[in-house]
Amino acid sequence: MASFDVVVIGAGPGGYVSAIRCAQLGLKTAIVEREFLGGVCLNVGCIPSKAMISASHFYHRAIHDAPNMGFKVKGIDIDYGQLAKWKQSVCDKMSGGVQQLLKGNNVTILMVRRNLNPTLKFL
């Protein structure tokens, strides 16, 4: 059975930063996450919302500002499937960055898709 000095539950912004700092201080550290590294904000909240807002600003500029710059825009079609893929790629890239930060600081990542075993001992 593995033994750690610190086990951080949750790999959101508070969790992964705490785990990295503990590891930097020389503690054998693990982080436990159920769904995705980076937490809700990075994966389904703030970041995906801001990615979509950025895309909508791009669309608005193409329609309203481009003609003032001399571009003749006849029409723009939105491929919502591709837009969703792009948004997901933004989130995946950032989540991958969190993973690299954790690995680079020697934090053990434990992805657990079920509840923790109640017989685990935390001292």
Predicted regions and their residues:
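Glycine-rich flavin
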Residues: A2-S3, I20-L27, V32-L123
